[in-house]
Amino acid sequence: MKPFSAIREIARQLLRDEFQGDADQEFADDELDLHINKVLVEISNKRPYEVKETVESDGTREIALDAIKDLIGDKVIRVEYPTGNYPPSELKFSIFGNTLTLESKPTSGEYIYLYCHKVHQVTESASTLSPDLEEVLIEGVVASAGTAFLNNTRKQIVPSSMRLYQAWVDRQSINYQISLNQITRPKAWEF
């Protein structure tokens, strides 16, 4: 697991933007952070962070999904209620906007498990990415930051150099897209 700052520094090295003497770096930390977060969402759309959220029932059939941060895609995949049974008891539900409506009304104070897809998170102390997804993240950050740099400096670069930069950015973008397209969900056994 690489911390957020390590992801940023590896991307910076691949972009050849390491700090050298009095020279300013081309990419500010917050700029690279924007690219990291953008690519995290792209990766999460291909292979989301799968998590079980525990919600305490208020005695109604409706659950507000606003409190669950970073939901993506189908949001909630399945609902388990009552909890603790084997095999798990799945409950039918529907979602409209940010409200999940259960088929039957649970008792107030009982717990309900929501199996959700969320955006992956990378911090200084934890990461939900596997090592292979960390590599895709770094490739994506390099491609995204390289494209942004090229677009911002296009008028300042002489045409012959521009072709070299454009070829490099295109190659990075293609490598990232290939890696992103190869991401598949791991196979899981259904009970």
PLM region spans:
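Solvent-exposed beta-hairpin/edge-strand motifs
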Residues: 66-84
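Internal mixed-charge
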Residues: 1-13, 30-34, 38-44, 88-191
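Surface-exposed ligand/attachment interfaces on beta-rich extracellular proteins
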Residues: 55-69, 123-131
